[in-house]
Amino acid sequence: MKVIEGGFPAPNAKIAIVISRFNSFINESLLSGAIDTLKRHGQVSEDNITVVRCPGAVELPLVAQRVAKTGKFDAIVSLGSVIRGGTPHFDYVCSEMNKGLAQVSLEFSIPVAFGVLTVDTIDQAIERAGTKAGNKGAEAALSALEMINVLSEIDS
């Protein structure tokens, strides 16, 4: 029986991080966690990491699609945070963003790691951006690294 599993080291990988500016006080912590993880666990050179900023979470799928279309990257890490308010806007944003990012991954056959917080409160966002509940940006970076290696193994 052959089992395919990906590790984390991917020293030659080219990674794009697409990040929304809205709620930047949270997102910058996610970005720090992602970059640290790519460098420490993935052994990815800083020269091979490109950060692309966009206004908000709704724009992430289009930016990810354009990045994927270039063919220059082995994976995309999407980062942002959507915090529930008093209207149904949260549900629409989260649903469409999630669908859009998944579509990019399938359309271009590239890992698009999901590091976008979808939370009810600012406190929950803070907890998931590097305090009590870990750093979801770092976790998304690990997922991207592992998927690069899994897909490489499948293709070899």
Swiss-Prot record:
It comes from Vibrio vulnificus (strain YJ016). Pathway: Cofactor biosynthesis; riboflavin biosynthesis; riboflavin from 2-hydroxy-3-oxobutyl phosphate and 5-amino-6-(D-ribitylamino)uracil: step 1/2. 5-amino-6-(D-ribitylamino)uracil binds at residues 22, 57-59, 81-83, 114. Forms an icosahedral capsid composed of 60 subunits, arranged as a dodecamer of pentamers. It catalyses: (2S)-2-hydroxy-3-oxobutyl phosphate + 5-amino-6-(D-ribitylamino)uracil = 6,7-dimethyl-8-(1-D-ribityl)lumazine + phosphate + 2 H2O + H(+). GO terms for molecular function: 6,7-dimethyl-8-ribityllumazine synthase activity. Its EC number is 2.5.1.78. GO terms for cellular component: cytosol; riboflavin synthase complex. The keyword Transferase applies. Keywords: Riboflavin biosynthesis, Transferase. It holds the Pfam family DMRL_synthase. CDD domains: Lumazine_synthase-I (cd09209). NCBIfam families: lumazine-synth, PRK00061.1-4. GO terms for biological process: riboflavin biosynthetic process. Belongs to the DMRL synthase family. InterPro entries: LS, LS/RS, LS/RS_sf. The gene is ribH. (2S)-2-hydroxy-3-oxobutyl phosphate binds at residues 86-87, 128. The active site is at 89 (proton donor). This is 6,7-dimethyl-8-ribityllumazine synthase. Catalyzes the formation of 6,7-dimethyl-8-ribityllumazine by condensation of 5-amino-6-(D-ribitylamino)uracil with 3,4-dihydroxy-2-butanone 4-phosphate. This is the penultimate step in the biosynthesis of riboflavin.
